[in-house]
């Protein structure tokens, strides 16, 4: 289990999607070269756990008739659903994507990890550039919303380090917090040493992979009944040893998150990029 396996898994899915996407585009569209398939979120980062959903964004330039786009998308997606794949998808133009991202922080966050899979690579690149530019430009609006969402999530899911059956993704100190730290770093608000939580991310991700692999229907909560099996698979002596390391990993993430918000509060909202520029 590890990053290499997650990337290999993503690459295998990419290949299958690419063939199907291009075939369907050629069969249903008058200008198949003007659409693109991209991955966003965790799949966009190439971090695909065994039971993860596939987050897809299908882009087009608006020149095709809507009924052709619908027929194309259905022809592409229905066989994937029939195979049992869980797919969260959106179909948008560049301008639609940009507009929605300014209104919905979840969309904005997902676009930060956008990765081209097939079709018009220039269109994919333009949307990725828009996403990063708008995230940085609107950080004073987005970061308070991100902070609030993190606080709300902690209320719902608790703190990973102190839970008997933690949600590895949603709990405080888990994978979603690590992704939030990446987003904050990309905003330019403050510099963040993400290397400080690299080992934490690797461990929590590996635990999640084993959890998904042992039970494809499982989600992200590490139940007591699963802990011994996961521990032995990863080379720990028992569940207690595993959970001790998971708690340490979560506390490292939690500490970096607290430190990051403290630094942002100390700047009074003035970005690190702008401070450095003014100091020259």
Kindly give the residue locations of the regions a language model identified.
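Short, polar/flexible loop-turn hinges at active-site or ligand-entry regions and domain interfaces
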Residues: 60-69, 117-118, 137, 188-193
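Conserved nucleotidyltransferase catalytic core and NTase-mimicking acidic/glycine-rich helix/loop elements
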Residues: 135-272
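A glycine-rich phosphate-binding loop feature that marks nucleotide/adenosyl-phosphate handling sites
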Residues: 92-100, 224-228, 270, 274-276
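Active-site nucleotide-donor binding segment shared across nucleotidyl transfer reactions
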Residues: 18-70
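Conserved catalytic core of two-metal-ion nucleotidyltransferases
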Residues: 10-18, 24, 59, 67-122
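Extended, Lys/Arg-enriched charged tracts that mediate electrostatic binding to polyanionic substrates
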Residues: 14-18, 23-24, 28, 33-36, ...
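N-terminal membrane-targeting/anchoring modules of bacterial envelope and secretion proteins
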Residues: 58, 75, 123-124, 128, ...
């Amino acid at each position: 289990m590890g990053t290499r396996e997650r990337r290999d898994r993503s690459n295998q899915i990419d290949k299958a999607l690419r063939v199907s996407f291009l075939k369907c585009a050629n069969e249903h569209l008058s200008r198949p070269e003007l659409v693109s398939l991209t991955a966003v979120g965790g799949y966009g980062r190439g971090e695909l756990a065994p039971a993860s959903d596939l987050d897809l964004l299908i882009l087009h330039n608006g020149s095709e008739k809507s009924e052709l786009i619908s027929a194309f998308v259905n022809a592409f997606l229905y066989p994937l659903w029939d195979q049992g794949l869980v797919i969260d998808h959106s179909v948008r133009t560049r301008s639609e994507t940009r507009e929605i991202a300014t209104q919905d922080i979840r969309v904005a966050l997902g676009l930060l990890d956008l990765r081209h899979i097939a079709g018009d690579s220039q269109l994919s690149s333009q949307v990725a550039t828009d996403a990063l530019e708008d995230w940085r430009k609107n950080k004073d609006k987005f970061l308070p919303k991100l902070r609030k969402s993190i606080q709300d999530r902690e209320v719902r899911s608790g703190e990973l380090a102190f839970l008997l059956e933690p949600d590895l993704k949603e709990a405080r100190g888990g994978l979603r917090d690590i992704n939030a730290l990446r987003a904050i770093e990309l905003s330019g608000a403050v510099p963040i040493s993400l290397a400080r939580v690299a080992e934490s991310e690797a461990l929590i991700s590996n635990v999640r992979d084993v959890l998904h692999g042992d039970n494809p229907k499982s989600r992200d909560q590490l139940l007591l009944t699963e802990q011994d099996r996961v521990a032995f698979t990863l080379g720990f002596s028992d569940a207690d040893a595993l959970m001790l390391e998971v708690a340490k990993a979560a506390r490292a993430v939690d500490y970096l998150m607290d430190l990051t918000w403290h630094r942002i509060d100390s700047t009074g909202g003035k970005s690190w990029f702008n401070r450095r520029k003014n100091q020259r």
